[in-house]
Amino acid sequence: MDDSMDYPDRDGDDLDQFQGTARSQVVQNQPHDEEVNLSESESFAGADEPPAAPRDASLIESHDMDEGPAAPARTLSPTGYEAGKHAPGGIANSDEAPPGAYNAQEYKHLNVGEDVRELFSYIGRYKPQTVELDTRIKPFIPDYIPAVGGIDEFIKVPRPDTKPDYLGLKVLDEPAAKQSDPTVLTLQLRQLSKEAPGAKADMVGRLEHTDENKAKKIQQWIASINDIHKAKPAATVNYSKRMPEIEALMQEWPPEVETFLKTMHMPSGDVELDIKTYARLVCTLLDIPVYDDPVESLHVLFTLYLEFKNNPIFRQHMEMENKLDGMSGGGGGMMGGGADVLGL
């Protein structure tokens, strides 16, 4: 028997709709179970989107499906609801470009060379690298702990009995880590106060015989006394006559004078002259003026001698000249005669 005779007469439109043999037709005011507001871009599905499943499968199963399997139904449901991000359980398309992103289709019509087109191709090839930085917080012990220091040396913690201790005013305030030697401290204060030497009895440093660090303390004592003598200001002398500056006397002599000094020797102390005349002669050779009293001129001479002696440049120069003199057996050089006179 022909299978087509088993089907009862039914509306051809319904059969075409469910069998999928007739063309699709949009039905206005189609009844539906749920209403969703969609935008114009989401109203109709695109050609590349797959057909979505029907919203309610019971509508299809309500027809006579007992005689045989029916063809898959074609529905006209809005694709924005099923395939979009607003559908229940739907997954949004992660490949969609964000708004304002670079689109290669917009720049295909440009009239540019192949090299420029190749540059545009690098834009699409670029893939940014995502670098995740791990934030690690590690406990640590700081090397230095900030603390508020002494604002003023005269601001001290008061005594428990509320009596003034005058620390820093009447009693010398020193750090407790390294105490000063009382004898050295007294000499320093005496030097600063410029008291008369005989005003107070001299303090003498003492060391215990059983002290283990006796040698070290002796070296510290010698170094402290040397520092006191170095810090002592030079004596101030007011000359009655005008004297040249020490820096001017230390200047290099003219070349002709140096040439002359190389060919002759300065008078030594064996010359038959009294001390006053010999002092005048030496001061005259060094461009130091000599007046009736040669004491001030000799003071300038000895000051010049100390400047040459303490100057490291001249000291090194004179040591080299002395070595050369010892090797050659003669004397000469810059300020050679002056050095002989000054004893350098």
Swiss-Prot record:
InterPro entries: Intraflagellar_transp_cmplxB (IPR022088). It is found in: Cytoplasm, Cytoskeleton, Cilium basal body; Cell projection, Cilium. One of its GO terms (biological process) is regulation of protein stability. GO terms for cellular component: ciliary base; ciliary membrane; cytoplasm; cytoskeleton; intraciliary transport particle B; motile cilium. Keywords: Cell projection, Cilium, Cytoplasm, Cytoskeleton. Its main location: cytoplasm. Disruption phenotype: Individuals have short, non-motile flagellae. Residues 1-16 have a biased composition (Acidic residues). Residues 1-100 are annotated as: Disordered. It comes from the Eukaryota. Residues 18-30 have a biased composition (Polar residues). Component of the IFT complex B, the core composed of IFT25, IFT27, IFT46, IFT52, IFT74, IFT81 and IFT88 as well as associated subunits IFT20, IFT57, IFT80 and IFT172. Interacts with IFT25, IFT52, IFT70, IFT88 and DAW1. Forms part of a complex involved in intraflagellar transport (IFT), the bi-directional movement of particles required for the assembly, maintenance and functioning of primary cilia. Plays a role in maintaining IFT complex B stability. Belongs to the IFT46 family. This is Intraflagellar transport protein 46. It comes from Chlamydomonas reinhardtii (Chlamydomonas smithii).
